[in-house]
Curated annotation (Swiss-Prot), chains A, B:
GO terms for molecular function: ATP binding; homoserine kinase activity. Keywords: Amino-acid biosynthesis, ATP-binding, Kinase, Nucleotide-binding, Threonine biosynthesis, Transferase. The lineage of its organism: Bacteria, Pseudomonadati, Pseudomonadota, Alphaproteobacteria, Hyphomicrobiales. This is Homoserine kinase. One of its GO terms (biological process) is threonine biosynthetic process. It catalyses: L-homoserine + ATP = O-phospho-L-homoserine + ADP + H(+). It comes from Methylocella silvestris (strain DSM 15510 / CIP 108128 / LMG 27833 / NCIMB 13906 / BL2). Signal peptide: none annotated. It comes from the Bacteria. PANTHER family: AMINOGLYCOSIDE PHOSPHOTRANSFERASE DOMAIN-CONTAINING PROTEIN, AMINOGLYCOSIDE PHOSPHOTRANSFERASE DOMAIN-CONTAINING PROTEIN-RELATED. CDD domains: HomoserineK_II (cd05153). Gene3D superfamilies: 3.90.1200.10, Phosphorylase Kinase, domain 1 (3.30.200.20). The gene is thrB.
């Protein structure tokens, strides 16, 4: 949750003069998104989300994110759509930060996704990959295989504070992944952070996918691996193969996996588990003062990694081969 | 800002079955209120605020707060109005906490109130006092003169960590206030926390007064003293007598102050300054882990107290005598 920057009523009124949204009717800082400050903004024309981009988001990537949302929305995907300024731009400045207004999506995220929800998620992910296939923009994954050792190095000496033996576990896993990472898989735009709190449901249908600020070009099947870890484990930590099978099955019905992709899932899932374990570990040691953020427990993802290390065959994760 | 308790989609759906509000369309935790968890709740019938009452609010006082809001709304005051359950009650339970739904008020709070805003605030406060005059409920002020020494005692030994000499300043002020606190002033329901972030404006008019969870029976003029401190000092710390005069003038045009009330304002303002300085100091030393709260700087209110200690006559604060 996050509101890092306060917005004054005077600054907001001045900012809105760049838009055709009428005057402000309400503004509430919301507990959504970890990297940016987000507000529900109500104006004379409707309800929107106002985002102020904080330092952790590279400003150079903002046009990529915003034009990706435009592209996906134009293809009928339920994602936030950037609202144009009178100047036709989508990116302004407010309270000293880059800022944008996007449409508000109805829906509530699922705290405990069901097997059917995992199927819906799989289909939505395939739709996202297909809708983005002809998107011209490009952004490298700043949190890929090459980045993980660099994330780990500055905190390696403290990792065992969180759990004895953690530093050795991470070093060994990094070596395994460097040696075994799959090459030449189909690439494209991935969401890269499609956790349950970024998927909105209305009744039994997915009404929206949000928070594209990790989107990048990478292996499409790596996005599935991220979702496998985020959606298909039970709260107690057990993997649920029915959820995996539902997700992979629904995805593959729209975008079939190649044999190489299917085979690579266990390794990709180990990488995805390590990636979130590492960034959570970094956050754990680096909660900025006054950030109003509860760092997520990194051990959840180390436990998932430990389970994934026991998997010999993608079918054990629900992949249909 | 605060969201202490997460609400699952399943628990929320079950909770809404007690209401005639239709199904949920969106739920966003918001950065509003320090004591409770607040959400903007959108349903098929409209937009509301959902509040989960956390431990710091005495559960026994919740019926008082909710019936006060009913009373004020019935008299035309723009305040949140509790939404009735099918059972006619206004107080339910959600995620293990007492919980209520109230109407959503449009408007944006003023970060830097103008002189005219201070006049509007004065009039709104008088309207609140008058509208509450025939309210039957009663609640003692848990943070009154008698409570301040008890707030201070457990943190007295640490006060000088915040500023050298602070403990002695507080002790001397407590003695002064015990000896000089005005008696027999007109009493009634006071808001007791009417800071700028609890007053919503649409354009140049006040569109709503919110957050009644400190409301109680006390000296009506003490409510004015709280507002004087919260509204009539500039960001740099200087007192603005024009703002004081605007506030007192607009208030008195609806509810004239007695001579005793007018004369008491400087002492009441010292008490009000000490009350907020003390609770901020307590919070400063007691930020609960994971509370997602930025404690407010207690020194702001000690600086106001210091200025108020130099005031010999209520007219120096803008009171018309």
């Amino acid at each position: 949750m996050a509101v890092y920057t306060e917005v004054s009523d005077a600054d907001l009124a001045a900012f809105l003069e760049h838009y055709n949204l009428g005057r402000v009717r309400a503004l509430k800082g919301i507990a959504e998104g970890v990297e940016n400050s987000n507000f529900v903004l109500s104006t004379e024309t409707g309800v929107y989300i106002l985002t102020l981009y904080e330092k952790r988001v590279e400003e150079g990537s903002l046009p990529f994110f915003l034009s990706l949302l435009d592209h996906l929305a134009a293809r009928g995907l339920n994602c936030p759509q950037p609202v144009r300024m009178r100047s036709d731009g989508a990116l302004g400045r407010l309270a000293g930060r880059p800022a944008a207004i996007v449409t508000f999506l109805e829906g509530v995220c699922r705290n405990r996704p069901s097997i059917a929800d995992c199927a819906r998620l799989g289909a939505a992910l395939a739709q996202l990959h297909l809708a983005a296939a002809d998107f011209k923009g490009s952004r490298a994954n700043a949190l890929n295989l090459e980045a993980w050792p660099k994330l780990f190095a500055p905190i390696a000496f403290r990792a065992d504070e969180v759990k004895a033996g953690l530093a050795a576990t991470i070093s060994a896993e990094l070596k395994f992944l460097q040696a075994n990472w799959p090459r030449d898989l189909p690439r494209g735009i991935i969401h890269a952070d499609l956790f349950p709190d970024n998927v909105l449901f209305l009744g039994d249908e997915i009404s929206g996918v949000i928070d594209f600020y990790f989107a990048c070009v990478d292996d499409l099947s790596y996005d599935l691996a991220i979702c496998l870890n985020a959606w298909c484990f039970e709260p107690g930590g057990a993997f649920n193969i029915d959820k995996g099978a539902a997700m992979f099955g629904a995805y593959a019905s729209l975008r079939p996996l190649s044999a190489a992709e299917a085979k690579a899932i266990p390794t990709l899932a180990r990488g995805a588990a390590l990636r979130f374990a590492l960034t959570r570990l970094v956050d754990w040691f680096n909660v900025p003062p006054g950030a109003l953020v509860n760092p997520k427990n990194p051990l959840e993802y180390f436990a998932k990694l430990q389970m994934l290390q026991t998997i010999g065959d993608a079918r054990e994760l629900g992949v249909l081969i």
